[in-house]
Each structure stands twice: as C-alpha cells, then as structure tokens.
C-alpha cells in the first residue's frame, strides 16, 4: 500500500474549542464580512485591497506586517477596505518546496500537520486581534476550511485548483467573498464556469458527511495572468481584457459580476516591482470605463516588510521565503495612491 498513515488529525471542532475566537472578534468579523459583501454586490463604492506576503511563514513578522496596515486602513477608510493576505497554504508548481505554515510550521524542519493546523489558526486569530482586520487565505485543501472558516473574510481558489470539482462545490457552501483565479492556461471560460458552479446549490460528500449547499453569491473571478503552451507568461489585466471579461460575464447566469486583479504572478512575470505600475493602470482604466469600474472591485498585491525574497534559512525578518514581494514603504505609498485614484 502506498499510503503510510502517520497521525489522526484533530477535528475542526476540537481545534476551535482549544483556540476559540472571542465574541468581540466574532462581531468584528461579521461587520467586516458585511462591508466586503456590499462591495462585491455593488452596494458600496469602496475598493478592496488584498495585500500581504506571498506566504505567511512566520507568525511574528506576519502579524507585525498586518498591524502596520491598521493606521493606513483608518486613513483610507472612506475609499478602500484593506484585507490582509495571510496565506498559510502554498501550492507548488512541481509539488516540491515550502507548502506553507499549515503543513510545515517551521520551514527548516519536517512537516507536522497537527502543529501546522494549530499554527494556522493561532496566526489568523492573533492577526485579527492585533490589527482589527480580518484576513484572506487560499483554500488549497478543501478539508482544511473548517479549521479557519470562522476567521476568514476572503477566500481565494488558486489557478491550479479552480478546475477541481471539490473546490468548486466546497466554495458553494461559503458565506464570504470567494475569488476564483483563472487557470494557468488563462482560459476565461474555465474560470467563469467555476464561478457559476460555486454560485449554485450542490449535494456532495464533505469531510465524511453527505451535505447540501445553498450556493455562494459572493463568488467572483481573479485575473492573475497565464502561461502559454510555449511556457511564456501572458497578462490579462489590460483594458481590452477587462472589457472582454465584462462581455463574457453578461452572457453568464450568475449574480454580482466582479473581478479582482492579481498584480503579481503571471501578470507581472514575477517582476514584483511591476505591481505598482499594474495597480495604477487598472485604477486608470476604471476611470476611463464605467463598465470596468463596475466590474473591478479590487486588487491583490504581494507585499511584506522587506522587499524581494530570500532562501529558507537566511532569517531576514519580514522577507518572503517564496515569491518576491514589494517592501513596506512602496506598499504603503501604493495603498494611498489607490485610495486617491478611487474617486
């Protein structure tokens, strides 16, 4: 048999009981969820900025980073809603490399899933408590959702997961904003089919139960660029891409058509400084076209305390150990610029 069963994992209920979210923070999350929902549904003209490290590898530096966003959020509260990006699960192109704190709480030690699930939950609770901001994470493993479902205000489904039926069906049971990235091929129809699937009711098996879901009307798309059959990166954040997406949305039987633009990954060719220019181009195009303005509800930006990236083991505080990120000063200025352009 090719599986070796190492540990029986605690259930989500057991982890939640050991590390509960306080009543005060539960109420804060409900308020934040409602604000974000209003943006996705077109009831609130504020703009979403989903910003943070490529991977949330270290609790202290991640929570330090998230807490720095608090003052900026207060300054831009009339124009922007900041959603810290705290990604505890990382997809890997080849399956090798650091897979996130949920799998490997210490990047320099062996994987430990039990400690990883605890570390994931503790980090999210601490980030909310210290910053007053509820966060975004990627749902890489649908069965892990239960460990953080009471903590997250935004969930992303990655380019490699968006075609998977279990991801689509699981999102249909969420009650928070959920972004479906375009697949690495760049196919808009695949992405929109995922939105359609997640917005509708389903009957399936989840964590050992037969379940029914009601559909998630807050499911939308995330444009992250693509990779051609020749291995070249292609972008999909330009004016003509957004107009095409708007036209395709019009033909779909979905509600709340919305898009978030991922400024990194294939849109930047992983040239992290390009995120600044890309963000401003998207904001400019929103000013040029009412259709684009109504469609594009936010940006996704990879940012940390120190710019660039490092190898595991170099121990530079607040510097990414996965994809390179914008540094703090550039990030801070960019958020203020985005707020100014959302007029």
Regions found by a protein language model. Give the residues of each.
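Acidic (Asp/Glu)-rich catalytic clusters
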Residues: 40-43, 70-77, 125-130, 213, ...
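Active-site-facing alpha/beta catalytic cores
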Residues: 66, 79-244, 265-266, 270, ...
């Amino acid at each position: 048999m090719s599986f070796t069963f190492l540990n029986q994992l605690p259930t989500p209920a057991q982890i939640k009981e050991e590390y509960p979210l306080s009543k005060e923070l539960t109420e804060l999350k409900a308020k934040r969820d409602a604000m974000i929902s209003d943006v996705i549904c077109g009831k609130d003209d504020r703009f979403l900025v989903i910003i943070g490290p490529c991977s949330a590898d270290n609790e202290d530096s991640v929570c330090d980073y998230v807490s720095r966003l608090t003052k900026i959020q207060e300054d831009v509260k009339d124009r922007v809603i900041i959603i810290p990006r705290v990604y505890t699960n990382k997809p890997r192109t080849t399956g090798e490399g650091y897979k996130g704190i949920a799998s490997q709480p210490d990047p320099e030690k062996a994987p430990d899933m039990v400690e990883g699930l605890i570390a994931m939950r503790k980090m999210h609770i601490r980030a909310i408590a210290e910053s007053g901001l509820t966060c975004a994470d990627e749902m890489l493993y649908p069965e892990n959702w239960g460990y953080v479902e009471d903590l997250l205000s935004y969930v992303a489904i990655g380019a490699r997961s968006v075609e998977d039926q279990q991801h689509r069906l699981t999102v249909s049971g969420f009650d928070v904003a959920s972004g479906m990235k375009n697949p690495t091929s760049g196919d808009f129809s695949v992405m929109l089919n995922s939105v359609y699937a997640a917005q509708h009711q389903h009957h399936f098996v989840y964590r050992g139960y037969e379940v029914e879901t009601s559909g998630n009307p807050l499911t939308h798309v995330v444009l992250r660029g693509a990779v051609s059959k020749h291995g070249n990166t292609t972008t999909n954040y330009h004016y003509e891409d957004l107009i095409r997406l708007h036209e395709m949305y019009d033909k779909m039987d979905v509600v709340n058509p919305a898009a978030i633009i991922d400024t990194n990954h294939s849109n930047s060719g992983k040239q992290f400084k390009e995120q600044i220019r890309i963000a401003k181009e998207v904001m400019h195009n929103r000013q040029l076209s009412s259709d684009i303005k109504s469609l594009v509800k936010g940006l996704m930006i990879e940012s940390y305390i120190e710019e660039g990236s490092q190898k595991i083991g170099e121990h530079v505080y607040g510097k990414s150990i996965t994809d390179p990120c914008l540094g703090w000063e550039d990030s801070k200025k960019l958020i203020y610029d985005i707020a100014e352009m959302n007029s």
